[in-house]
Amino acid sequence: KRWFTPAFKAANPRVTTTIMEGLAAADDHSYAQLCRCLAHHDLRADLRDIRCPLLLIAGERDSSTPIANQELVAASVPGAQLSVIPEAAHQVTVAAPDTTANLLRAFMDRVTRQTRTELPDD
């Protein structure tokens, strides 16, 4: 339920099984260390220092990284953009690849245009 919504699992059993098997094959010690790092390192005070464009893509039903957490990051980083994918859980790139790609493409196009206008003429 954390990685995919029940509806996605029912509609895409093969994809879900493949992803879950890949996660299960991960080294237990390394995965536990990663989870510990994520749980114990509070970087909220550092967010305001981020000065590069930031796009956050959240799944509406993501219990691992709730939208409230994403909203906190977006509010703390100047100019950050938060996009929420409806009916998606944590694995938004798997559950909604086209939507994710379109969001990334639009973000990169916007950032590229802004950067070009900020560059000095040679």
Question: What are the functions of these language-model segments?
Answer:
Residues 27, 66-69, 96:
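Active-site helix-initiating loop/hinge in glycosyltransferases
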